[in-house]
C-alpha cells in the first residue's frame, strides 16, 4: 500500500474563503530572511507555530497580569491571557472573513515582551532605562521575535512575516518608528495596520477587562456590590438572573461575564461590518489608507471606558495590589542597578553580549525575560545574606 501523497507547493487554499480586504498569506510582504515556502502550512500558520514553540511563549506561564504568580493558582497569567485573546480574536475573524491564522499569531505574540510583575514591572524597567532610550513592551515583543529568540541556525529571532510583526507592534514612538524601516512607516505616515492586527488589539481589551473582573472577585479585592455601579456589569447581571433565577454565586458571576464578552463581541462585529461597508476596502492597501475599521460603537466604547475606570480605581489601585507593585518595582530597580554597577554579576551569556555601549539594553533584555518567580529568586540570590 502506498501511503505517499502529493502536497501542493503553496497551500494558500488552507485559508478558506477570505474577504478581499483580509491579509492573504499568498500576498505577504515576506520575511527578513528568505525561506522556501512550506508544502503543508501557510506563512501565517508557520508564524503561529514558531511563536508557540518559542522560549518566550513558555515563560508567559509564569508572568502575571495583576497578581504575583504564586498568590493563587486560579489567577490569570500572561499565557492564559494570550490564549483567551487568541480565542476571542479568532472567533471574530471568522465572522468577518479575516485571516484566522494571522490574527491568532498576533494574539499569541502580543505579550512576549512583557516584564515580570505586569505593568508595575514595565513601569519600573522603563524608569531605569529612561537615560538609555526607555523600555516599551510592544517594542520588546518585536525584539523578542526579531532578535532575542535563539532557535534557528540561519538567523536570530523567529523570522516572522511582516504582517505578524506589524500586528505585534501596536504602539511605537516616532523616534523608534524611524529606525524600523517599512515596519515603522505607518506610525510616521498615519496609516493603519491590517484588520487582523486591529482585531487582535481590541480582542486584548475585551479579554483583560472581563478577566480582571473575574480575578478581582476571586481575590476579594472588588465586590459584587461595587460592580453594580458599572452599567455594563449591572445590565448583564440582571439578564443572567432573569434567565437563570435559581443560579447564584460563582456560576452567576461566570454567566454575567460570559454575557458581557458576548455583548462586546457582537457590538464589535456589527460596528466593524458597518465601517467596512462604508469605506468598501477592496484590498489590504485600502485598509491601510482608511481610518481604523475594527471598532466598538460609541455607546459600547463609553460603557467599556467606565468599566476600565472602575478597574483602575478599585482593583489596580487597591492597596494590596499597590503593595505587590511596590515590591515588584523594588526588585526590578535593585536588579537593574546592581547589574549596571557590576556586570560581572550577570549570567555569562549576557556578559559576553554586553559591551559598554549596549550594556543597559542587554540588562533590560535579561530582566524583561525573567518570570515573576525567577526575578524574586534572582533578587534573593544577590541581596539575601543567607542565599547562595
From Swiss-Prot:
GO terms for biological process: dGTP catabolic process. Pfam families: HD (PF01966), HD_assoc (PF13286). It comes from the Bacteria. Residues 24-44 are annotated as: Disordered. Gene3D superfamilies: Hypothetical protein af1432. The keyword Ubl conjugation does not apply. The keyword Hydrolase applies. GO terms for molecular function: dGTPase activity. Residues 78-209 form the HD domain. Keywords: Hydrolase. Belongs to the dGTPase family. Type 2 subfamily. NCBIfam families: dGTP_triPase (TIGR01353), PRK01286.1-1 (NF002326). This is Deoxyguanosinetriphosphate triphosphohydrolase-like protein. It comes from Ralstonia pickettii (strain 12J).
Amino acid at each position: 500500500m502506498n501511503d505517499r501523497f502529493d502536497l501542493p507547493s503553496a497551500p494558500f487554499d488552507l485559508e478558506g474563503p477570505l474577504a478581499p480586504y483580509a491579509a492573504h498569506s499568498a500576498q505577504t510582504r515576506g520575511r527578513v530572511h528568505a525561506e522556501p515556502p512550506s508544502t503543508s502550512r501557510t506563512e501565517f500558520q508557520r508564524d503561529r507555530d514558531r511563536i508557540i514553540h518559542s522560549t518566550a511563549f513558555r515563560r508567559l506561564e509564569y508572568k502575571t497580569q495583576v497578581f504575583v504568580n504564586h498568590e493563587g493558582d486560579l489567577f490569570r497569567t500572561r499565557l492564559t491571557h494570550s490564549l483567551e485573546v487568541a480565542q476571542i480574536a479568532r472567533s471574530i475573524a471568522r465572522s468577518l472573513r479575516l485571516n484566522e491564522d494571522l490574527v491568532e499569531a498576533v494574539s499569541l505574540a502580543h505579550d512576549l515582551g512583557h516584564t515580570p510583575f505586569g505593568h508595575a514591572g514595565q513601569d519600573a524597567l522603563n524608569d531605569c532605562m529612561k537615560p538609555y532610550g526607555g523600555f516599551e513592551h510592544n517594542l520588546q515583543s518585536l525584539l523578542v521575535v526579531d532578535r532575542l529568540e535563539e532557535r534557528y541556525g540561519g538567523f536570530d529571532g523567529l523570522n516572522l512575516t511582516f504582517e505578524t510583526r506589524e500586528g505585534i507592534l501596536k504602539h511605537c514612538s516616532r523616534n523608534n518608528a524611524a529606525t524600523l524601516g517599512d515596519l515603522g512607516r505607518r506610525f510616521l505616515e498615519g496609516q493603519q495596520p491590517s484588520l487582523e492586527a486591529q482585531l487582535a488589539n481590541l480582542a486584548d481589551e475585551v479579554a483583560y477587562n472581563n478577566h480582571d473582573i473575574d480575578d478581582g472577585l476571586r481575590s476579594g479585592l472588588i465586590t459584587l456590590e461595587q460592580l453594580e455601579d458599572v452599567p455594563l456589569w449591572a445590565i448583564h447581571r440582571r439578564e443572567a438572573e432573569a434567565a437563570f433565577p435559581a443560579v447564584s454565586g460563582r456560576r452567576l458571576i461566570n454567566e454575567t461575564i460570559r454575557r458581557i464578552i458576548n455583548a462586546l463581541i457582537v457590538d464589535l462585529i456589527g460596528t466593524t461590518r458597518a465601517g467596512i461597508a462604508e469605506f468598501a476596502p477592496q484590498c489590504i492597501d485600502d485598509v491601510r489608507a482608511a481610518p481604523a475599521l475594527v471598532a466598538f460603537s460609541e455607546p459600547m466604547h463609553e460603557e467599556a471606558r467606565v468599566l476600565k475606570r472602575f478597574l483602575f480605581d478599585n482593583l489596580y489601585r487597591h492597596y494590596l495590589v499597590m503593595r505587590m507593585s511596590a515590591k515588584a518595582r523594588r526588585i526590578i530597580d535593585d536588579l537593574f542597578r546592581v547589574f549596571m554597577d557590576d556586570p560581572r554579576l550577570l549570567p555569562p551569556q549576557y556578559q559576553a553580549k554586553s559591551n559598554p555601549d549596549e550594556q543597559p539594553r542587554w540588562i533590560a533584555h535579561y530582566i524583561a525575560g525573567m518570570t515573576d518567580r525567577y526575578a524574586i529568586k534572582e533578587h534573593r540570590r544577590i541581596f539575601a545574606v543567607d542565599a547562595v
